[in-house]
């Protein structure tokens, strides 16, 4: 039972992360810097406790994956700033799932049977339909897509980098807790570079506030590591993706966004389709 509670940490951590980041009027760059600082502090504590062996290869690969994360997370924050948590996060989660799936198929050749291909294609279609449905909005007597192509573009590009962040270590077979510290160093290095390149003053208060954003992300990341070790990739992966429920519904309720019954129907149906797609994908892992 306790391991399933640990498996819920990614659900809550990744679900509340974008909500926490947007509780205060911070720029995406400030959100990224605060998150990265907190992630590095958390990684240093874990390194001190666990003392994992870090090789030159694992350091370089994990450092690069951290850079990919920074670009992806910055764009995700920008996508949220241009829309809302409830609108951007289903797109982000869904397109990351599709991106990771395509990478697994094209690079790792994971779908070797006709059955696997059918299940995988159905899963991807369900996820994409679910993503679009969560963005529907009632205007008069009509239901229209409320998310602009501009926001879709930002979030999809974000998902491209976040997918690279996820698969880079897998590509070089770098696993375990040795990933966390060099990855966090890469995250912070890139975040500092992004803020320096912006050449505008940052708010220390905003950066400090977003240490909580980083803590939420770090706890989720640790929970995912622990759950995967015991439950396996398929189960822990499926559970963790429920973070889209927390982010979407939590974003609507906490930021007091008014939704009509019809809009709620589309949002909840879209989330359900995404989760069904996730379950189908987990069958292939």
Swiss-Prot record:
GO cellular component terms given for this protein: plasma membrane
Membrane topology of this protein: Multi-pass membrane protein
Keyword field: Cell membrane, Membrane, Sugar transport, Transmembrane, Transmembrane helix, Transport
SUPFAM superfamilies: Multidrug resistance efflux transporter EmrE
Molecular function in Gene Ontology: carbohydrate transmembrane transporter activity
Subcellular location(s) per record: Cell membrane
Annotated Pfam families: Sugar_transport
Membrane spanning residue stretches: 2-21, 31-50, 55-77, 111-133, 146-168, 172-194, 207-229, 233-255, 262-284
Keyword Transport annotated: yes
Record-stated family: Belongs to the GRP transporter (TC 2.A.7.5) family.
Protein's UniProt name: Putative sugar uptake protein lmo0424
């Amino acid at each position: 039972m306790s391991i399933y509670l640990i498996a819920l940490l990614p659900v809550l951590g990744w679900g509340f992360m974008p909500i926490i980041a947007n509780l205060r009027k911070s720029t995406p760059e400030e959100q990224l810097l605060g998150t990265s600082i907190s992630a590095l502090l958390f990684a240093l504590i874990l390194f001190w406790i666990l003392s994992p062996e870090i090789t030159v290869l694992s350091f370089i690969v994990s450092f690069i994956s951290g850079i990919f994360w920074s670009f992806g997370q910055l764009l995700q924050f920008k996508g949220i700033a241009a829309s809302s948590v409830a609108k951007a996060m289903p797109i982000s989660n869904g397109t990351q799932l599709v991106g990771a799936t395509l990478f697994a198929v094209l690079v790792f050749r994971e779908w070797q049977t006709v059955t696997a291909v059918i299940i995988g294609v159905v899963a991807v279609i369900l996820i994409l339909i679910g993503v679009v449905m969560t963005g529907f909005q009632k205007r008069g007597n009509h239901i229209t897509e409320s998310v602009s192509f501009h926001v879709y573009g930002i979030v999809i590009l974000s998902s491209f980098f976040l997918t690279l962040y996820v698969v880079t270590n897998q590509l070089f077979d770098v696993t375990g807790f040795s990933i966390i510290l060099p990855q966090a160093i890469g995250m912070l290095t890139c975040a500092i570079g992004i803020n320096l390149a912006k050449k505008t003053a940052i708010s220390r208060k905003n950066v400090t506030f977003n240490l909580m954003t980083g803590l939420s992300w770090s706890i989720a990341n640790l929970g995912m590591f622990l759950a995967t070790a015991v439950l396996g990739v398929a189960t822990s992966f499926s559970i963790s993706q429920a973070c889209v429920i927390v982010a979407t519904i939590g974003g609507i309720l906490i930021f007091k966004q008014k939704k009509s019954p019809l809009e709620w129907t589309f949002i909840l149906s879209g989330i359900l389709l995404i989760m069904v797609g996730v379950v189908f994908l987990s069958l292939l892992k």
